[in-house]
């Protein structure tokens, strides 16, 4: 059985490898209500207790307006963790599905949510935004870029958005989706089920299914892809500080 301590240890390694947290940071955690954003919040709140670089946390939910999504459990969790929480009601669902009737609603919805997040976190004095993208998300995004665009591309572990003056960090990149789900269940986190009609019908789901099929014959296919992303090196991905140390040691031995 996993523990929050062990889980947070892996998160810390990712944070350290990519220099995600600096002293005095006020980090907004983007909380969708899904398992990944909640385990990210739990891990960062735990890490905050002993991390050598003092930092503050704040939870922010952009409520897109889909019916039946109750965030009261998330609010209670934040209260118990001593993390300020803000839920921002929006009409994103109405704009995307009713007014615009987008053929690709996920893209516009994502942009609008990110814009609302950036605005809210700046209003609350936050300088960094922690997102719940994990190991599997990174591999899937890379494969989507390859299969659908013919490019080798993925979001970065740390991204500075100059127009918004916001630094995005992704501390869960060393955590697999199943481990995240297991810990969320073990801790009985207040997961809010998405009622979006596009859930599990996207191009991302197609790639997820493809990787699942490949992993039957090649069980470590996701790890191989992730390793390739760090070794290319893909912009912003590698080598990590730990790998630089190992490289220097190998050169000394030679």
Predicted regions and their residues:
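ATP-dependent adenylation/nucleotidyltransferase module used to activate substrates
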Residues: 1-143, 148, 178-186
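Conserved active-site and cofactor/substrate-binding residues in soluble primary-metabolism enzymes
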Residues: 6, 112, 175, 202, ...
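Catalytic subdomain that performs nucleotidyl-dependent activation
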Residues: 56-57, 136-216
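Short, solvent-exposed coil/turn elements at secondary-structure transition points
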Residues: 63-65, 91-93, 161, 174, ...
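Short, basic, helix/turn surface patches
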Residues: 110-122, 158-164, 211, 215-230
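The feature marks non-catalytic terminal segments
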Residues: 189-254
